[in-house]
């Protein structure tokens, strides 16, 4: 985080060298007056926010930790429907696995059976 280089007082007390073809002194003064006002506003805002931050931290530290009650995600009535769905899915999976094993066995017989015949 960048630090603030000038305070409102530093800007107010700054003197510029005067030259023949220099800037308009009144214009520079008006501009610097606006900058000073901005700095004062920023300083007040930072002070206010720091105070609010401190107050909120104190409130948070003083507040006891509350745990939210755990609620079931599904109603009890739908649990039986879910169990029957799981059972039917596992039956489909085992049937699918059995079909895959049969196909694999048949392919192995074709591939390795030919290799055994070729060796003889």
UniProtKB/Swiss-Prot annotation:
Chain segments carrying region Disordered: 63-88
Any one of the GO CC terms: cytoplasm
Gene3D superfamilies for the chain: 6.10.250.660
Protein's UniProt keywords contain Disulfide bond: no
Domain of life: Bacteria
Record key words, sorted: Cell cycle, Cell division, Cell shape, Coiled coil, Cytoplasm
Compartments it resides in: Cytoplasm
Coarse class of the protein's main subcellular location: cytoplasm
Listed NCBIfam families: DivI1A_domain (TIGR03544), PRK14127.1 (NF010725)
Similarity comment: family membership: Belongs to the GpsB family.
Quaternary assembly: Forms polymers through the coiled coil domains. Interacts with PBP1, MreC and EzrA.
Name of protein: Cell cycle protein GpsB
Organism: Streptococcus sanguinis (strain SK36)
Name of the gene: gpsB
């Amino acid at each position: 985080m960048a630090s603030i280089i000038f305070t409102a007082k530093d800007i107010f007390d700054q003197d510029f060298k005067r030259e023949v073809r220099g800037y308009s002194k009144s214009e520079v003064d008006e501009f610097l007056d606006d900058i000073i006002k901005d700095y004062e506003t920023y300083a007040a805002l930072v002070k206010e926010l720091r105070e609010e931050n401190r107050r909120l931290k104190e409130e948070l530290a003083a507040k006891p930790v509350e745990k939210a009650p755990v609620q079931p995600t599904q109603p009890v009535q739908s649990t039986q429907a879910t169990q029957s769905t799981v059972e039917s899915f596992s039956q489909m999976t085992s049937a699918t696995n059995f079909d895959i094993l049969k196909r694999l066995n048949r392919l192995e017989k074709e591939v390795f059976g030919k290799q055994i015949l070729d060796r003889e």
